[in-house]
Structures are given as structure tokens and as C-alpha cells.
């Protein structure tokens, strides 16, 4: 039996992976939390290798807040629902240490725990969740065909919830300190850096918005930008340049991040002279954009110039019967709570669309 697992062995650091277990003792808790060693918490979720059923009323591609919420709503509407979770079951929140801004949790909640709760809630109403990755889709004919590494499925309706991934710096130490100082969301993690010196990487609207937001918490904020001018809107530039807590480091790129259990210094390099500088910093926020996870939908769905899925009427895509929710379309808000609301809307749209076409017997 396989379980998806995220375990926490030090503050703000999560390991992710899939393990195989032969111990029947775990049968009693196929979805739950096991606490063992002093600082180790395991979030376990039973991983099905496939589903005996191959045709569904609704197939949801991707998990996370949008996918799981959509599953809750479609299953409660008595629609046969399958979620194919993707490469990281639970999405980006599986790499977030603590979530403080999701309603209903006054003391905050660990990202993996929130995702396990959402998954269990969807499964409670009958949603089947398969931990696999979609490799190809065919939306040219109905029923829609969705192919994974291990199985092929068909569905009357599809909800795409594949999200978007933050662009990375591409240096080895970035992954090493991810969750231990390196972050990709100031709104999510800013409050954890009170009194710290902070570095923001980027020169667009997002970078400046995050820099200004972080001045509420950090002792100082340095914005490292590879050019000598900003791409951000003029009004944001004026606000950021006039902010006494923000300092700009022009024509530089981050070359390394160093520290012990947590990052302590950021190393930058001048792209013209090659001269290097070192800054003490407790946090590094990478704000160089996001990339929607839409590669498999090219030629199948209409995408915008940044490859985000375009929506027409509500959550409907360019293909009748295919809907989308969450960060795969939303490149403005990118919050767990907005993704969950988006998933709810898509599920309601799907239910009404299927009901109108009488695909499901009432």
C-alpha cells in the first residue's frame, strides 16, 4: 500500500514524497496524522494507483484548494467524481509551513494538514482521489479522454485545477532553503519575518507590492533587480522608491544563499562587473513571476499570451464542458481562499451544465 507523506522534522521545513508500507497497523488510519518522534509529524493520505471505474461524470485535474473544493461540491451533488492529484498532491500548500490567513483557523494551520483535511472532506462525500499525473488530454470529442502514467479515463465534464508554479532563481541553494527563509509569497509568509532583514528579487509589480508589504514586518527590505530600471507601474515605482525602508540593488542577481538550519546570508553578483556582495538576511522572497501548469492543454484550450487558461462565461473555458478554477487562470490573487472559492464556482457551473444536458439521471 502506498501513502502520500509530508513530514516535518524541523521548523519551517517539509519533506515530501511517497512511501510504500506493508504494515497492516496503518489500515486503521488510511487518512490521518501520526505523531512519533519529538519533532516529527506525518500527514498520511492513502494513494490509489488507479481507479476501477474508468468513466466519471466529473474529472478534476489537479488537487490543492481549488480541486479539493470542487470535489466536495460535485460529490455532494451526487456526481461521480475523480480527482487526479498531480505531481504534488495538495499543490503548493504542501510546501508551506504554516497558513495563518485561511478563515476558520484562528491559530493557523500547517499547509499539509489543511490539504489533508480538504482531501478527507472530498473523499467523505465520495470523491475518488488518484495520486497520478495527467500526461495527455483529448478535449476534441466527447466523452473527454484523460490519460495518466498508469490509466486512461473518460468524463462528461472536466475541471482543470493544475495551478501555477513560481519561477525559480535556478541556483542549487534555493531548494535547500525553501521553507527555511526562501519564500515565493509575501502575503502568505511575511508575518513570519518580523524584525528580520529581507531581500526581494524582481522588478515588476509583484516584486514591488511584496516589498512594500514586507516593510510592515521586516527591519529592512532590499530589492535585487537584474536591470537598472523597473518594469513595474509608475505609481508603484514612486511608492517603493520613496519608502525609507526599501533599498534597491541594481544590475545584480542572486548567486547564492547560505546558512545553517535557516538561511542567514544572500550573495549577489553584479552582472556587468562580476563584483559580489553579501547581505545578512533572514528572508528571501522570489517575485519573478509564475508559470501556469498548462503545457498539456496547449492546442486543446485557449490560453492567453502568458499561457494562463482563458475563461469566458464564469468558469467555462473555450471548450464546452471543460471548466477551470484557481491559479491556472487567476494570476492576480493567487491565494488559497480565492482558489477554494473558484473551485466552488466551477463545481456549481459543472453541475448546472450537466443537469441542463441530462448527462446524469436524477
Task: Give the location of each predicted region.
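Extreme N-terminal leader/targeting segments of oxidoreductases
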Residues: 21-57
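FAD-site-proximal beta/loop scaffold in flavoenzymes
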Residues: 36, 41-48, 170, 175-192, ...
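Beta1-alpha1 glycine-rich phosphate/pyrophosphate-binding loop at the start
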Residues: 48-125, 196, 208-234, 304
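Residue-level detector of alpha-helix initiation sites
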Residues: 64-65, 88, 164-166, 205-206, ...
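A Rossmann-like FAD-binding core segment of flavoenzymes
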Residues: 122-148, 152-155, 215-313, 352-362
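Predominantly flavin-linked oxidoreductase catalytic cores and closely associated redox partners
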Residues: 152-248, 257-258
Amino acid at each position: 500500500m502506498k501513502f502520500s507523506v509530508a513530514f516535518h522534522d524541523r521548523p519551517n521545513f517539509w519533506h515530501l514524497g511517497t512511501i510504500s508500507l506493508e504494515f497492516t497497523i496503518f489500515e486503521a488510519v488510511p487518512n490521518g496524522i501520526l505523531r512519533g518522534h519529538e519533532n516529527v509529524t506525518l500527514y498520511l493520505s492513502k494513494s490509489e494507483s488507479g481507479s476501477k471505474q474508468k468513466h466519471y461524470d466529473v474529472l478534476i485535474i489537479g488537487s490543492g484548494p481549488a480541486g479539493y473544493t470542487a470535489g466536495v461540491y460535485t460529490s455532494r451533488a451526487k456526481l461521480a467524481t475523480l480527482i487526479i492529484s498531480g505531481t504534488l498532491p495538495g499543490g503548493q500548500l504542501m510546501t508551506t509551513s504554516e497558513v495563518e490567513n485561511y478563515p476558520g483557523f484562528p491559530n493557523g494551520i500547517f499547509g499539509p494538514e489543511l490539504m489533508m483535511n480538504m482531501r478527507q472532506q472530498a473523499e467523505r462525500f465520495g470523491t475518488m482521489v488518484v495520486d497520478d499525473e495527467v500526461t495527455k488530454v483529448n478535449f476534441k470529442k466527447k466523452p473527454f479522454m484523460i490519460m495518466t502514467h498508469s490509466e486512461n479515463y473518460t468524463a462528461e465534464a472536466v475541471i482543470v485545477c493544475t495551478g501555477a508554479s513560481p519561477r525559480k532563481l535556478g541556483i542549487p541553494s534555493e531548494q535547500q532553503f525553501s521553507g527555511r527563509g526562501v519564500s515565493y509569497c509575501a502575503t502568505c509568509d511575511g508575518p513570519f519575518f518580523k524584525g528580520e532583514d529581507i531581500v526581494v528579487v524582481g522588478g515588476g509589480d509583484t516584486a514591488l507590492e511584496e516589498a512594500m508589504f514586507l516593510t510592515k514586518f521586516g527591519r529592512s527590505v532590499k530589492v535585487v533587480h537584474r536591470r537598472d530600471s523597473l518594469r513595474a507601474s509608475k505609481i508603484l515605482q514612486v511608492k517603493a522608491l520613496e519608502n525609507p525602508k526599501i533599498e534597491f540593488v541594481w544590475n545584480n542577481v542572486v548567486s547564492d544563499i547560505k546558512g545553517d538550519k535557516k538561511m542567514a546570508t544572500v550573495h549577489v553578483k553584479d552582472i556587468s562587473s562580476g563584483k559580489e556582495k553579501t547581505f545578512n538576511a533572514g528572508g528571501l522572497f522570489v517575485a519573478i513571476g509564475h508559470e501556469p501548469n498548462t503545457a498539456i492543454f496547449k492546442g486543446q484550450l485557449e490560453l492567453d499570451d502568458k499561457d494562463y487558461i482563458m475563461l469566458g462565461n464564469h468558469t467555462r473555458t473555450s471548450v464546452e464542458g471543460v471548466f477551470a478554477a484557481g491559479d491556472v487562470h487567476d494570476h492576480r490573487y493567487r491565494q488559497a481562499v480565492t482558489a477554494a472559492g473558484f473551485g466552488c464556482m466551477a463545481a456549481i457551473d459543472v453541475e448546472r451544465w450537466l443537469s441542463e444536458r441530462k448527462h446524469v439521471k436524477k
